[in-house]
Amino acid sequence: MDILKKSLFIVLFLGLVSLSICEEEKRENEDEEEQEDDEQSEEKRGLWKSLLKNVGVAAGKAALNAVTDMVNQGEQ
């Protein structure tokens, strides 16, 4: 009976150790995925920022051209 108890204890202990290792690996994988998501979000923000900047520059140039045309028409 004593041998059976020791064997059962060893099996349970090894099961808990392997479960703990699996949980740790799972947490590491989740952390890596979260970091990848953060990097992708930063890339998207950078793309939106450059897109909005380019749109702003284009709108500014268009407005400047419109004002210049109005001034030129007023001089004629």
From Swiss-Prot:
Protein name, as recorded: Dermaseptin-H1
Modified residues (Glutamine amide): Q73
Compartment(s) of residence: Secreted
Role description: Has antimicrobial activity.
Record's GO cellular component terms: extracellular region
Signal peptide region: 1-22
Sequence segments annotated as region (Disordered): 25-44
Expression by tissue: Expressed by the skin glands.
Keywords for the protein's UniProt record, in alphabetical order: Amidation, Amphibian defense peptide, Antimicrobial, Cleavage on pair of basic residues, Secreted, Signal
Family per record: Belongs to the frog skin active peptide (FSAP) family. Dermaseptin subfamily.
Pfam families the record matches: DD_K (PF12121), FSAP_sig_propep (PF03032)
Species in which this protein is naturally found: Pithecopus hypochondrialis
Main location: secreted
GO biological process: defense response
InterPro entries in alphabetical order: Dermaseptin_dom, Frog_antimicrobial_propeptide, FSAP
Proregion span(s): 23-45, 75-76
Biased composition (Acidic residues): 30-41
